[in-house]
Amino acid sequence: MPKSPSKSSPRKGSPRKASPKRGGKGAKRA
């Protein structure tokens, strides 16, 4: 987790499977 602190933020609110499902990974990075 220390590698990407940004992932820890969204992970707190929603699970990891919900991130890629909604495309949050691309939207958050964009």
UniProtKB/Swiss-Prot annotation:
<feature type="compositionally biased region" description="Basic residues">
    <location>
        <begin position="9"/>
        <end position="30"/>
    </location>
</feature>
<feature type="modified residue" description="Phosphoserine">
    <location>
        <position position="14"/>
    </location>
</feature>
<feature type="modified residue" description="Phosphoserine">
    <location>
        <position position="19"/>
    </location>
</feature>
<keyword id="KW-0832">Ubl conjugation</keyword>
<keyword id="KW-0158">Chromosome</keyword>
<keyword id="KW-0544">Nucleosome core</keyword>
<feature type="short sequence motif" description="SPKK motif 1">
    <location>
        <begin position="4"/>
        <end position="7"/>
    </location>
</feature>
<feature type="short sequence motif" description="SPKK motif 3">
    <location>
        <begin position="14"/>
        <end position="17"/>
    </location>
</feature>
<comment type="function">
    <text>Core component of nucleosome. Nucleosomes wrap and compact DNA into chromatin, limiting DNA accessibility to the cellular machineries which require DNA as a template. Histones thereby play a central role in transcription regulation, DNA repair, DNA replication and chromosomal stability. DNA accessibility is regulated via a complex set of post-translational modifications of histones, also called histone code, and nucleosome remodeling.</text>
</comment>
<protein>
    <recommendedName>
        <fullName>Histone H2B.2, sperm</fullName>
    </recommendedName>
</protein>
<dbReference type="GO" id="GO:0005634">
    <property type="term" value="C:nucleus"/>
</dbReference>
<dbReference type="GO" id="GO:0000786">
    <property type="term" value="C:nucleosome"/>
</dbReference>
<comment type="similarity">
    <text>Belongs to the histone H2B family.</text>
</comment>
<keyword id="KW-0539">Nucleus</keyword>
<dbReference type="GO" id="GO:0003677">
    <property type="term" value="F:DNA binding"/>
</dbReference>
<keyword id="KW-0597">Phosphoprotein</keyword>
<feature type="region of interest" description="Disordered">
    <location>
        <begin position="1"/>
        <end position="30"/>
    </location>
</feature>
<keyword id="KW-0238">DNA-binding</keyword>
<feature type="short sequence motif" description="SPKK motif 4">
    <location>
        <begin position="19"/>
        <end position="22"/>
    </location>
</feature>
<feature type="short sequence motif" description="SPKK motif 2">
    <location>
        <begin position="9"/>
        <end position="12"/>
    </location>
</feature>
<comment type="subunit">
    <text>The nucleosome is a histone octamer containing two molecules each of H2A, H2B, H3 and H4 assembled in one H3-H4 heterotetramer and two H2A-H2B heterodimers. The octamer wraps approximately 147 bp of DNA.</text>
</comment>
